Amino acid sequence: MKKVRLENELPESIEKWGWKYHHIGIPTDKFMPGEKYLPHLRFFVSGFSESPFGIEWMRFEKGCTLNKLIQTVPHLAFEVADLNYEISLHNLKVISEPNSPGDGIIVAMIEDNGAPVELIEFLKNK
């Protein structure tokens, strides 16, 4: 029987698996100040570096090939020590294969309960 989490308990991914909260990504169709363009992914990001809570805005170009769930539903992002290990250990449903949006970082998107979740591995930790 699956354990029901109480209101005062942290999610299992943090409490037991050791994942660390990194940011929340929110899709938008509005231009945001300080946008940075990621040409290989065809979208703009902003807000992350200024937000004390890790709020990141994402504005997608027409023709962006990322999964529509990523483009339309906010996602949580967690830092993990070994992205591929976590995916296989927990039998996670991958909706965007591991890729590198920048130097020293690998990300993948999974789906849980209809919502996208980003896993981030920083290669400097290796």
Where are the model-predicted features located?
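Vicinal oxygen chelate
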Residues: M1-T65, N91-K126
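Mid-chain, well-packed structural core segment of small domains
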Residues: L69-E97
